[in-house]
């Protein structure tokens, strides 16, 4: 009779990697990735707003405060997922939602909480100065195109499956799952529910 460890070593010596197979996103949990997962695009794909507010040129609001607000003309509203049709000029702002692309010439976003309404819907009072780049998520800030995200051989947990989904993939190659069986033998083996001798 051989020991468990020796038996295990002998068994592993004879095992070869199984070929890969395609697996759908919803079936990936717990599977072993058979390919490197690399980004084919930047995330975010372009500069976008990190919060609801107003896209501005930072130098326009350099001296803004609650005691001395800067009034800017609002020239457009840009919902999340949309792109501004106008470019900012000095003295202008564009109302922008979280996730919307940063308009041309804008270099920062003032959070809506740091503004107050102007005389009409076409102007806004800016109550605080911001530095260039404030509240802007830069293109590729999270992931850059070509970046290795998940290495081949990784067991896929929920966070890796979510990352694969964010890449727009609906299936990837995983290692084929082995079929495993256990055979118990011997005259001392008892069926489930039978008393042990």
Question: What are these language model-derived features?
Answer:
Residues 55-197:
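Short, glycine/charged-enriched hinge/interface segments at domain edges or termini
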Residues 1-68, 95, 138:
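Short, low-complexity N-terminal leaders and the immediately following helix N-cap/first helix
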């Amino acid at each position: 009779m051989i020991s468990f460890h020796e038996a295990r070593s002998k068994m592993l010596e004879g095992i070869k990697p199984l070929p890969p197979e395609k697996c759908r996103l919803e079936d990936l949990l717990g599977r072993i990735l058979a390919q490197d997962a690399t980004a084919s695009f930047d995330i975010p794909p372009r500069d976008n707003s990190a919060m609801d507010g107003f896209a501005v040129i930072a130098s326009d609001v350099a001296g803004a405060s609650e005691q001395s607000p800067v009034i800017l003309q609002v020239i457009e509203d840009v919902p999340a997922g949309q792109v501004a049709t106008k470019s900012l000029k000095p003295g202008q702002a564009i109302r922008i939602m979280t996730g919307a692309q940063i308009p041309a010439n804008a270099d920062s976003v003032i959070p809506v909480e740091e503004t107050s309404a102007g005389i009409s819907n076409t102007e806004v009072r800016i109550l605080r100065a911001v530095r260039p780049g404030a509240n802007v998520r830069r293109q590729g800030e999270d992931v850059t195109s070509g970046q290795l995200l998940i290495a081949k051989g990784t067991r896929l947990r929920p966070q890796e499956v979510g990352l694969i989904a964010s890449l727009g993939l609906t299936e990837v190659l995983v290692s084929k799952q082995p079929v495993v069986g256990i055979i118990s033998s011997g005259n001392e083996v008892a069926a489930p529910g039978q008393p042990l001798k």
